[in-house]
C-alpha cells in the first residue's frame, strides 16, 4: 500500500473500502440512487443494475430512489449511506458511529444490515462505537483510550 500513488490509493479506497459515517455524508443534490452509486460513477464504471436493485430491496429503499436526502428520515439516510458503502462489494467496511444519531429501532435495523453484509458477503466490518450493546454484538472488541489500546477481547471465535 505504501508504494501506491495517490491515484492508486483513491481507486483502492473506492473499490475495497466502504465507509459509513455518523452524519451520513450524503450529497444533498443527488437522489438516493445517485448517492448509492456514487463510488461506481467516480470510478468511471457502469452501474450493476442487479446489484443496485438488490441493495435497494435489502435496505428497504424501494420506491425512494428519486428522493433527495432532505426528503428522508435519519434512518433512511443512514440506509442510503450503507448502500453507498456496500455498492462496490468492498472487502472492508468501516463504520464510524453508524447508529449515533438514530433511535433504538433504527439502530437495531442498521446494525442488522451491517452484520448481514459481514456474514453473507464475508466483508470485514470495523465499527467505532460508544454504545456498549452494539460493541457486544461484535466478534472482537478493541478498547482505545487516549490513542492507546487498553484491551483486546474476543467475544466469539
Regions found by a protein language model. Give the residues of each.
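ABC family nucleotide-binding domain
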Residues: 1-144
Amino acid at each position: 500500500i505504501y508504494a501506491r500513488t495517490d491515484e492508486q490509493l483513491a481507486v483502492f479506497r473506492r473499490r475495497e473500502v466502504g465507509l459509513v459515517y455518523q452524519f451520513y455524508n450524503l450529497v444533498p443534490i443527488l437522489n438516493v440512487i445517485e448517492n448509492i452509486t456514487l463510488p461506481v460513477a467516480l470510478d468511471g464504471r457502469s452501474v450493476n443494475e442487479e446489484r443496485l436493485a438488490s441493495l435497494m430491496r435489502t435496505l428497504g429503499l424501494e420506491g425512494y430512489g428519486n428522493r433527495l436526502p432532505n426528503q428522508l428520515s435519519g434512518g433512511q439516510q443512514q440506509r442510503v449511506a450503507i448502500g453507498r458503502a456496500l455498492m462496490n462489494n468492498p472487502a472492508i467496511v468501516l463504520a464510524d458511529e453508524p447508529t449515533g444519531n438514530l433511535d433504538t429501532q433504527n439502530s437495531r435495523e442498521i446494525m442488522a444490515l451491517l452484520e448481514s453484509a459481514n456474514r453473507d458477503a464475508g466483508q470485514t466490518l470495523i465499527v467505532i462505537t460508544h454504545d456498549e450493546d452494539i460493541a457486544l454484538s461484535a466478534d472482537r472488541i478493541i478498547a482505545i483510550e487516549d490513542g492507546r489500546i487498553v484491551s483486546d477481547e474476543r467475544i466469539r471465535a
